[in-house]
A protein has these predicted regions:
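N-terminal membrane-targeting/pre-transmembrane regions
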Residues: 2-68, 72-73
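A membrane-cytosol interface segment of integral membrane proteins
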Residues: 4, 156-192
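Short beta-strand segments
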Residues: 31, 122, 141-143, 166-168
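Conserved beta-hairpin
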Residues: 95-142
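Phosphoinositide-dependent membrane-docking surfaces
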Residues: 131, 141-156
Length: 192
């Protein structure tokens, strides 16, 4: 029996796109990072929004309402109205704490962290007075350092918040560890 030959498509030799980000156009360049921006990066960036304190607080409120409902029912089993209200509050708190990451992700999608088009690469430039975020399509956003309101940093990345759903995300893998620490210190100092 003769073997059937199948045609194979040639794989591209380089995953990199032909678009090159130009750092020359920025005056006072301090830091520059280019990275792939996909669902995983969006999920990591979203995890910085709101932190975990709100999730933990909603869980505590949920458990407190549940305990209070039990106390109310033990005190008077015919007093159903407060018990139902406490049960509803407990269920609401549980829903918030359970779906906290999905809520963060939806908020991130509707902010400047969301995808604009099909671009999968982002370029972040920090100068002496602003942070620029550009993508492969050439779209660029400028955030003044004077508007910097929050900086969330850990070993995985950094999220700078500028208010009005404007954020700049830099994963730590996009630059060397020493440059990343330097960037986080400089942004923390600019926020103060």
């Amino acid at each position: 029996m003769a073997k059937k030959k199948t045609a194979r498509k040639a794989r591209p030799t380089s995953v990199e796109t032909s678009y090159k980000f130009d750092d020359e156009k920025y005056e006072g360049l301090r830091f520059s990072a280019t990275y792939d921006y996909g669902e995983l990066a969006l999920s990591k960036a979203a995890s910085y929004l709101g932190g975990q304190k709100a999730r933990i607080a909603s869980f505590v409120v949920s458990m407190a309402c549940l305990a209070l409902m039990i106390v109310v029912l033990l005190a008077d089993s015919h007093n159903m109205a407060p018990a139902i209200v406490l049960l509803a509050l407990s269920m609401g708190g549980t829903a918030v704490s359970t779906n906290w990451h999905n809520m963060q992700l939806n908020y991130a999608r509707n902010s400047s962290l969301g995808f604009k088009g099909t671009s999968s690469r982002r370029h972040v430039v920090v100068t002496g007075d602003a942070v620029y975020v550009a993508d492969e399509s050439g779209a660029e956003e400028r955030y003044d350092l004077s508007d910097l309101r929050s900086v969330s940093v850990d070993d995985d990345g950094l999220l700078a918040g500028f208010g009005g759903r404007r954020y700049a995300y830099v994963p730590s893998a996009a630059m060397s560890a020493s440059r990343f620490r330097e960037l986080s210190r400089e942004l923390e100092a600019a926020r103060s």
